[in-house]
Amino acid sequence: MEEDVFPKAYDPKGLEDKLYAFWEDAGMFTAQSASNKPPYAIIMPPPNVTGILHMGHALVNTLQDVLIRYKRMSGFEVCWVPGTDHAGIATQTVVERHLYSSLGKRRIDFSREEFLEYVWEWKEKSEGIILSQLRQLGCSCDWSRLRFTMEPLASRAVKKAFKVLFDRGHIYRGYYLVNWDPVLQTALADDEVEYEEKDGWLYYIRYRVVDSSDEIIVATTRPETLLGDTAIAISPDDERYSHLLGAKVHLPFVDREIPIIGDMSVDPLFGTGAVKITPAHDRDDYRTGINHNLPLVNILTPTGKINENGGIFAGLSKEKARDDIITALDAMGLFVKKEPYTLRVGVSYRSGAVIEPYLSKQWFVSVDSFRDSLREFVASDSIKIFPPEFTRNYLSWVNNLRDWCISRQLWWGHRIPVWYHKSDEDRIICYDGEGLPEEVAQDPDSWDQDPDVLDTWFSSGLWPLTCLGWPDVEAKDLKKFYPTSVLITGHDILFFWVTRMVLLCSAMVGEKPFSDVFLHGLIFGKSYKRYNNLGEWTYISGEEKHAYDMGKPLPKDVTAKWEKLSKSKGNVIDPLEMIDKYGADAVRMALCSCANRGEQIDLDYRLFEEYKNFANKIWNGARFIFGHISNLTGKDLADGINQNLLGLEDYYILDGFNRLLKELESAYQSYAFDRVTTMAYEFFRNDFCSTYIEIIKPTLYGKQGNDEDRLTKQKLLAVLLVNILGVLHPIAPFVTETLFLKLKEAIGVIVDASSDEITAHALNMLRADSYVLAPYPQAMRITIPDNLHASFALAERLVYTIRNIRGEMQLDPRASLEAFVICPEGVSVDTYVPMMCALGGLSSVEHLTEEPKDRVYSLGVVEGIRLGVFVPIEQITKEKNRLEKEKIRLEKAIESVSRLLGSENFRAKANPDLVSAKEEALKNNRMELQSILDKLASFS
């Protein structure tokens, strides 16, 4: 074969871009909503519009694409809708930083409209980057349906959903404690808060009872919130303090008197048994305050500093105020002591700031009326969660769900569609139409629109509907593809996003948004730390880290650990770099191979190298086949295959392929992407290349069989190649498509149909312009011999015996040897001879009735079949010398151990285990010596 037509190594560079352009330009990814095919739809989890492709994106989109390609080939009308997320907090933060670094200006230096112009400009520039990167990965999305969470359709959907929920009484506004991010200056939902354990202090503070010499000591982790205290609470059953119930204590610095109240929520065993109540800055205290009708005193500004309610501490940061308050209390004799204490601190998932419980007027979705339906969808298996163990997590979370704070103090996002009358804020209009509400348009100076925007997850929660055309209930895509088939996402946003979609979509249209949810694990990378003599450590990066990733042994001062991907830890793997270095197929297969269904995916860097080599194996396997089927035509395949000419190895590979298809179907149904990849990998590499092709090589080269046998093998190779590449296509689309197009070109235009049970479907596949449009491989209807697997297993054991003899005799693996067999009565190995010769490196197998006396051979026995391999003359002397040396070594070892075991002193003093070990060693050495003596005798 011409080298320039089919180079020896697969080089994906250049090929991948051309193939993707071929697919996209031909409209192969475009779904037809009028199709009669069964629907299969996936809505892409939208990446942030300002982001770039990271390994998590690469994983989730590879898994989706594998399913989409598989289902498209399986006869479904597939619709994979791509899109990007406006990502309110994240995008606004990025643009603010950009404006400050480039112009030296902050957001507040612009009007809202001016700032949003910059954000839209940023969006237009950056959106194309991640979309082009998805193309590099091979994602076969329907780009004609590209969506953005703030496009006009999405805006209509969001306003419609808000108004529907508002009119039904499911959305309300009020002053409540929210999770406040003092850096971003916005409220966050409960599940946007991450919790960390930090070392802190438990401070003991003395409160003096008014008009009494009594005092009460309280333990707190946040002494600065003393400024907002409105009560001291004790357990009503706590006899230590029962005499103080109803009394008041003096609150220092702010000159207030606050009551001592009884509340059953107080734990008498924690601290001193008395707790300070700060309803405006603690959720538990808030509930206590409501129950006891206590005032709510907010002491913080939106930036996290002490406000005017803090008296002399106003304007200080909470950290500075804490220190100054403790110093002042100490001077007043009111500070008792402090003790080390481990704190559970809430942190913003976006800014990393410590979250403050903060009293603020916000919009909420009441979830109580949705709780039953959220639970029922999953409990009834209407929505199935994979892996199923996450079902328990989902149901537990739903049972403990609190009202969802949906307002955000941002400029970038969906503006809340509510207007307030300037003279009466309780007079409001909720409007979901275009432009202004009629009443506002008639008197615009008297109305203000709510300045806040909706939580990003509100618009994302409508994503399956938005992508398919809602709120137009007659939209063709909505009718054809809703509910969608499966949602694939990381388990970390099960509550952020998955539950919100179930809630909002079902509330809008009365139906679930998807049938299945597959939650993949989070990617971990290996990090390496180097420790010095002082116990200090640093993370290792660069070439040294890469060397360890590729298997270099670790020195004593370096330790390795699987950790979440982090630039600071040096364990981030850039998927674009991997694509450039190894090719998109290698990256896809590596990710699929480790896409287990647990919580953590340990992404071994060596997988990329392994699957690059496998892509090359696919290429070279096909290259070999092309060299032997160049004379085949479509007519040859249409003529079919004479099953009477099929050998054991042919039936075995065909049956194996049929079994593979069944196992793959099961794996796809359970979203076992790792099994899909591993099974396809092992079948191609081991069963097809290393076994089947090696067995039939003598026939292909004309050393066995006749021309008709050779043509049969050639046809079967072509059929198997197009089918196996078809199985591999969803996970490795580029190399398989390249080979498919070459195969079509080699075989030529296929005109004739075929009814042959082996070739018919392969011909149908080859009629397609691309694997993208080709039907998925089907099981071939063949009659399998009853004893196929037992026979093949026997043949494999015979081959293993031959290889074992070659190894023991240290025979040249390239040398072609002669062998003989002596079979029990009624047993024949004729069927196995081609396989024995091809895989065992034999030139011939002679049938004898007794062992030969005139030649040297090495003998093995398999199920009563005596198999002898003749040793070449030149090897005999060399092997005899080796055996003689080994004989001497064993004789010395036997003598030494025998002498030791014969010593009564040794047996009396030695550990019984040591004695047993020596006896076992002596036994093994004697057996090995006898084996060598037998071999030497065979040379005589």
Swiss-Prot record:
Gene name for this UniProt entry: valS
Gene3D superfamilies in alphabetical order: HUPs (3.40.50.620), Isoleucyl-tRNA Synthetase, Domain 1 (1.10.730.10), Valyl-tRNA synthetase, C-terminal domain (1.10.287.380), Valyl/Leucyl/Isoleucyl-tRNA synthetase, editing domain (3.90.740.10)
Coiled-coil ranges per UniProt: 872-938
Major localization listed first in the record, in broad terms: cytoplasm
Entry-linked Pfam families: Anticodon_1, tRNA-synt_1
Record note on quaternary structure: Monomer.
Keywords linked to the UniProt accession: Aminoacyl-tRNA synthetase, ATP-binding, Coiled coil, Cytoplasm, Ligase, Nucleotide-binding, Protein biosynthesis
Protein name per its UniProtKB record: Valine--tRNA ligase
Keyword S-adenosyl-L-methionine tagged: no
Position of sequence motif 'HIGH' region: 47-57
